[in-house]
Amino acid sequence: MKWINTACIAMVITVNAMANALPINGMNTGQIAALYPNLFVPAAATFSIWSVIYLGLIGFVLYPFISRKALDSSVSLLFQLTCLLNISWIFAWHYLLIELSVIIMMAFLGVLIAIYKKLNSQNRLSFWLLDVPMNIYFAWICVASIANVTALLVKWGIELPYPELITVFLIGVTQVLVWFINSTKNNIPYSLVIIWALLGIILKRSYSSPFFPEIVVAAAAGILFTTMYTGLSWRNQLMTSKPV
């Protein structure tokens, strides 16, 4: 199973690299996103988080090689499914099948939720190589799912009134997610990814016109809330149990 996991992540990294190097269907991933402009999309630099995600996933597949404990077979199967969905999404997105890409993204998110529920590390090695990578992955796909649905609305030509307020609402959705995730189990990696995404939104607005100060204020407030609530959740966890 561990060799299959290794092959799967190698395929994911290869396909994602090809998507921008070739690129697939003549456009890179960012150029396609530009076809469906919306105020929720963060600055291009924000997407560098994929380097962190892939580095973490490499650690994830290496875990069975360096640990005496094998990775749960059900988690391995779910991980392999995420790899298939990741690759499928790339092709759907690059061939402008946005409706299909949303369906794939929702399935992708569902599988990551299943993995999130199954992982519960009992030692530092599994925490850093299993929990942290998957929490980062899960958080970013939450953000990507919101952006993907927004892109679909743009493709359909649905012009909602006051797009800046819609974006403020979407930022609010990220905060509901932070609250829900951290109220069940303190998750600093998840929160850090949300902060990163909100910083990307602020950066994008700083060099875009119009500026939309309400979006910047909402994103800044989101960063503050995420930091404070995650810190409070972490403190409560320390008071009730031993740290991992």
Language-model features, listed with the residues they occupy:
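Membrane-interface capping segments at transmembrane-helix boundaries
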Residues: I66, K117-Q122, M228-V244
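N-terminal membrane topogenic signal
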Residues: M1-A7, W50, L192
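Membrane-interface helix caps and helix-loop-helix hairpins in membrane proteins
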Residues: W89-I103, S121-L125, V154-P161, F180-K185, ...
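Alpha-helical transmembrane segments and their membrane-interface exit regions
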Residues: M106-K117, I171-V176, L198-I201, G222-Y229
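Alpha-helical transmembrane segments of multi-pass membrane proteins
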Residues: I9-G26
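Central hydrophobic cores of alpha-helical transmembrane segments
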Residues: L81, P189-I201
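Membrane-interfacial loop-to-transmembrane alpha-helix junctions, especially the N-terminal start
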Residues: A70-F79, N186-S191
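Short aromatic-rich membrane-water interface segments that cap or initiate transmembrane helices
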Residues: A34-I49, L130-M134, G157-P161, L165
